[in-house]
C-alpha cells in the first residue's frame, strides 16, 4: 500500500493541513510539511484522535444549544432611537435574523423585531415584512393580544460577501463577524460595496425569473410602532422602487443560492449555528417575501464557519475530481502484477520481469526499442541493463548485432531468435498474401520446361569458349583480359533424336574473386556442367565449383576440354575427380564424362545430348506458365540510354510487358524485354532469360523477383526490403564498443584507413570487387580498407563530391566519368583509378595499403673511435682526443659511450668535431680528432660508437 501524505489526510478529515500537522506534533510524530508521508500505524492513531475530537465537539455544541437563553425582550423606543444614531453615520452591523421553526401553520405568526431606525418612524406607515429594509429588522414581536411563540435566537453568522448592503437598494448589508467562542467582540463592518459590482437581488432583477417559493399564509400586519418599517415610508406611501440591475457580476462574487424549502426560510448548513445574511422574518407572499430570511450558506472549506463540503471538495481542485478521495480495492490482476514486479530480478537498480525462457523473434538489425516493445519494457531500462551487465555503450534506437541481442536475452532469461533473411522475406510476402517459390495450381497445370544449365570451372579452362562453340558466337574475344567477369545467360536450341529441345546456359566467372557469382549460378540451375582442362587437371576453383553444385543438390556433367592439345590427359582428370566423389560411368559411377574441344568444336553435340539425357533421367522439369511470373535476377547494370536493366531468369509463370514487378529493393513496370541477342520479346516463359527495362534502380545480383497485382504493392514491398536491409547493414557495420575494449577502440580510431568508392558496369562485378578488396590482409592493424560508396554506372558528380569531402579514392571498373566530371575531379584533387581486369585492381590496392604503413627504422652503425686523451675546455667540459678505429665519425650523429664492452651512456650526440684546430663534418678511419659528446664522465680507452636510424621497406 502506498504511503499517505499529510494533505491527503487533511482532505479526508475535512480540516486544514496545519491542523493535521499540529495534531501530529501533539502525538509526538515529526513531519516536515503537508507533502510529507505518514506511516500506516500513525494514520490509524490520527484517525482515532480526530474521531474523538469530532465527538467531543459535537457534544459541546449540543450542550451550548441547550443552554441558549430565550429571545431577549424588545428594547424600548428610547433605546431604539439611541441605537439608530450610529447607523446614520455609517454601516452598523445588525443582529441575526431569528430562525423560523419548522412547518409554520396559517394563522398568527411572530413578526420580526424592528431594528434600529435612523429617525422617528411616521405612524401608520408599516409595510409588509417582505418589503422592509434589512437594516431595520430585528427579532419578531407578537401582535398585541396574541401570545408569541418562543423562537430560539441563533447566533450571528459572518458574511463573506462584501456586496450585501441595501443602503442604496442594491443588496443586503454585510453581516457582522461573530465573536470567538466564549468571548464577545465588537462587530466589524465590511467594506463599502461598489454599486456596479453588486449582484442583483434574487427576484428583483429586471428580466430575471422569480425565485420559486412555497405558498404561505399572509401574516397580520404589525401595528404602529410594533415593527420597523422603511425610513420615510408609510402604509399609503409610494411603492418601493425596484433597483436597476448593474453589470453582470463575477461568479466569484455571486452569493450562493439554493431552492427555498416550504416555509419561506432557508435552513443554514453552516458547521456552527449562525443566522442568515438577510433580514429575518420570512415576510408575506410578496416577490421578496422570506427571500433573504435564512440567508445563503457560505461555500467554504470544511471546518470553517459556513463551510460546505470538506477540504478539497471543490470540483477540479488541483486537477483532481471533487469530493473525498475514494479508496477502491485493487483487482486480482493488479495485485498479481504488483507481486510479479516485486519479484522481478534487478539489474543495476532496474527491475525487469524474467522471461522464463520465452522465445522472442527479432529481425536483423533490431534495436533495444524493438526488443522492449516485444517484452513490454521501457527501452531506457534495457539500455541500462546492457551498459551494466554487458558493458556495452549503446542507444535505444541503435541497430545491434545479433550476438548482442542474444546475450541480452540470456541475461533476461529470454531466448532470442534472429530471423534469417529468407524467413524475413517470406514473412514479408505472407503479409501481402503472396507465396514465393512454389507453383500455383494442380498437376494438370504444370507443363515441361527447358533445363537450366550452369557452366562452371577454373579460370582459363574454356567455359566461355564452350558456350561460343555451342551458340556459334565469339564472346570470349571481347572480354577484358580474356576472362569472364559477369554472369551471362543464353538459350540455345538443339536437336536430340529428331526433336528440338531448348537449353538455357548460364556462364559463371572462374576467377577466385567471383565466388558469390558461382554460388548464385549453382542455386539457379538444374544441371551443372563442370569444365576441366585436360592438360591442367583439377584446380582450386574446380573443387569450389564441385562444392557449390553439391550444396545446390544438382546433377553434374563433366566436360573434359582441350583434348586437342598434345599434353592432354583425360584419364588423369577422371582419376583426380574420383577423389571428389565424381566417378565416371565407365568406372561404375553415375556421372557422365564427355571429352570435348571447344576450340576445334569436337564432340559438342555429344555434350548437349548428355545434358538432355541427364535432365530426362534424373529430373522432372515442369512449371505452371499461367501463374504470375517469379524468378531470379542473375545480373543487373545501369545503361546510359535505357536506365536500370536486370537480366532475370523466369523460373515459374510467364513474364509479360506491362507487369508490375518487384526485384529486391527495386520495383517498377516492365516497359520492354530483350533476349540475349538484343531482340524485343513480349513474354518470357519458364526457363527463359531476358533483360528487363523499367526498374526504379539497379537491383543486386541474386535478388528474387516476382510479379504483383499493382505498383502500390510493389512499392511497399521494395521499401520494406530496403529498410530491413539498411538496418542489417547498420548492425553489421557497427562495432561492439565495450568497457573492456574502449582503449583499443580509441587506438583503432587513430589508424590509417584507405577509403574507397567502387563504381562498376555490373552489379555482380561491384559485389565481387568489394569482397575481394576487403579480404586483403596488410599484415598489420595499422591500416585498413573501408568502402564508403558503391554503385553501378558511370562516375557521377555526387561520387566526386563524396570523394573530395572524405578523401576517398574512386575505383572505376569498366566505367568512366560522365560529361565533364573528369575535369571536376582534377580540380578537386580526387584520385580516380580505372581498371578492366579485377586482379589488377586488387594488386594496386594492396600496394597502396602497404604504402600507407608507417615506416620502420633500423639502426646502422657509422663508425667507432677510441679515446686516447681527455682535454678540459672552459665552459665546454671534457673533450675526448680520439682516433677513428672504423667507419666514419660524423658531426650531429647519434652516439653511445662503451666502457669495457658495457654501454655507459646512450642517446648521446656528436656536438663538436675538430681536426687539429679546424671544425670538420666528418673524420674517416685512421685519423685523429677531437670529439665533444656533451658527457664529462669519459675515460681513456673508452669507445665512442656512432650510428644513425635508416628507414627500411615494409613487407
UniProtKB/Swiss-Prot annotation:
SMART domains: RAS. Keywords: Cytoplasm, GTP-binding, Initiation factor, Nucleotide-binding, Protein biosynthesis. Residues 225-235, 273-322 have a biased composition (Gly residues). The keyword Protein biosynthesis applies. Gene3D superfamilies: 1.10.10.2480, P-loop containing nucleotide triphosphate hydrolases, Translation factors, Translation initiation factor IF- 2, domain 3. Pfam families: EF-G_D2, GTP_EFTU, IF-2, IF2_N. Residues 49-352 are annotated as: Disordered. Residues 597-599 are annotated as: G5. This is Translation initiation factor IF-2. The gene is infB.
